[in-house]
Structure formats: C-alpha cells, structure tokens
Amino acid sequence: MIEQANQQIEKDVRDILKQVGDDPERAGVLETPQRVAKMYGEVLAYQGETIFKDYKLFETEETDDDQMVMMQDIPFYSMCEHHMLPFFGQVSVAYLPANGQIIGLSKIPRLVDFVSKRLSVQENLTRDIGQILNQILKPYGVAVQVTARHMCVEMRGIKKANSQTHTTFYSGNFKTDRQLRSEFLQLLK
C-alpha cells in the first residue's frame, strides 16, 4: 500500500512540475518526485494514527499536587493542514504527577513527534499533546506551550518573516491555579 501511495505521489509531483512550467525530465528535478514522496513519508509518519502507544509509566512515591515535572524546548516540525507548508518550533510540557505515576522523560519528545508528524494546525497540536498526556498519566494537571514559525505566514500571503505564534493548553491545577500557571510560564523565560 505504501509503495502504491509513493508511486501516486511521484506521478502527482511530475504533474505539478509540468503545471508550473518546468520539465520533469530536467536533470535538476529528475529525482524530485521520489524525494518528495520519501519526504512526505517521513514528515507525515503518523498521519491517520490516533493512539500513542510508545510510552512507559513508572511507579514512584506519591507526590504532592504541586510537584512539577517539566521538559522545555522540545524541537518539532509539522505540516500545516491548510497549505501543506511547514511550521516548526519548540514545545514545553509540564505535568503534576498523581497516583505515583510518572512517564519516562524520553517519551515526552516521542509524543511531540507523534502529534507533529501529521497534517495539523498549531492549536490542535498543542491541545492533542495536553490531552494525550492527561489520558496516559491522569495527573493533577498538564501545561503545554508551543511556540512556532509558520511558512504559510512567512513565505506566502502576508509574508511576515520570523513572526512567532504561541499557543497554550492547561488542565487540572494548571487551569485553576493562577500562581502555578505563572510559575510554569516564568520557567519558560
């Protein structure tokens, strides 16, 4: 099935090259259709997948509801579902462990990859990371901040280079406790 999809993408890329006035047999673009098909397989690796399974929970001593676990500046690359252009940036995630459950730290960047390697918008990417962590951990709260640059803003349309978009997700104590939310945001500076 993947091979068939790649062949279709390659055909479509050759057609696009023709439609924009290029020659798909020209030396510089001769292998472009294969490269584009391979690129989509990589950057959209989790397209259509809905269940994140690549994690392990660890038992730890019961913690207070204000003990924050935070991972900051996790890089990501994604594709805008509106224009199929890249958006990229950093994700910071914090959670308040409950019931003696913590997640392996390497699993948080894997979750970011799982959510970002599909067509999306930043608002949904932010929400999905937070909701999945809530489902897995059932913590006292989750906070997610995503800062990203969007090529659909920078290279087309309004063409505003280096502009950044910030989105946040809060649940549990992060949503109800303004001081805790402030502490999370202060740690991001």
UniProtKB/Swiss-Prot annotation:
Binding annotation for Zn(2+): 80, 83, 152
UniProt keyword list: GTP-binding, Hydrolase, Metal-binding, Nucleotide-binding, One-carbon metabolism, Zinc
Protein's gene: folE
GO-annotated cellular components: cytoplasm
NCBIfam families: folE, PRK09347.1-2, PRK09347.1-3
Chain segments annotated as coiled-coil in the UniProt record: none
The family this protein is said to belong to: Belongs to the GTP cyclohydrolase I family.
GO molecular function: GTP binding; GTP cyclohydrolase I activity; zinc ion binding
EC number: 3.5.4.16
InterPro entries linked to this entry: GTP-CH-I_C/QueF, GTP-CH-I_N, GTP_CycHdrlase_I, GTP_CycHdrlase_I_CS, GTP_CycHdrlase_I_dom
Protein name: GTP cyclohydrolase 1
SUPFAM superfamilies for the chain: Tetrahydrobiopterin biosynthesis enzymes-like
GO annotation terms (biological process): one-carbon metabolic process; tetrahydrobiopterin biosynthetic process; tetrahydrofolate biosynthetic process
Domain of life: Bacteria
Subunit structure: Toroid-shaped homodecamer, composed of two pentamers of five dimers.
